[in-house]
Amino acid sequence: MTDSSLIRRAARCARLMLVVAVCGARASAQQPGPQPLAAPSSSPEFLTRYDFQLSGTALAVDDKRFSWDTHFGGALDVVDYVRGRASIVADYQAMLGSEFRPFDPNQAYYTLEASGSVWAGAIEIAGVFHHVSRHLSDRPKRPAVAWNVLGARVLRQFSIGGTTLGVRAGAGRILQHALVDYSWTADFDLVARRSLTERVGVYARGSGELFGVDPASGDREMQRDGRIEAGVRINGRAGVVELFAGYERRVDADPFERLPLQWALAGFRLVNK
């Protein structure tokens, strides 16, 4: 796929926004987890924070199963008890190809998570229960593909000059799985944001994940995936739109083919303030 083809796809993101909204409405809503906070709160509060996202991303890869990547979901801080917070995450991710029609949903990820944290100085430490299940869309039904992780996560937000940095890192053990050979996971996420004007800012993000593989399940080694992206943030009264480009390597891109894929990407993301 050529660069001009990727640009044409990105130009059609307005049309895709409707598709994302329709697909997301079919499931209980990635924020992949609670976002890092600058400091603990001063008093207990209920429903203190909600991080929402709606995104559509065009993929440049020579595979008709992977043309678009969409997300609809969010993270909610249910209770802030000063020494930490209790949070939940719900996310629906739909992969769209072009095998049978221009926007052809063919698989989906459902992510659910619950966590509780405590502050240790300027660092937040959380215990996490994380569930992922993968499903085919508009395709014959197959066996379940899913895994549950019990792990820990550290979060930190700080500023350098006029740039705000958010850091998250975590690791966990697979407690239960179906049709995957993962035994443990580890991940990190780093995002840097800088305001240029009251309305416009720039940002860059890098994230990665490791999947330990059960030696008894086959001859695969530890799997690695990652994503980098950078773009602009345009602030509105109640929300922010991010326009970005980047590159991704995804482990087991198809749920029944244990092969990684790589692609360039460009897209949009709507988030709340």
Q: Where in the sequence are the language-model features?
A:
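Transmembrane beta-barrel domains of bacterial outer-membrane proteins
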Residues: 30-273
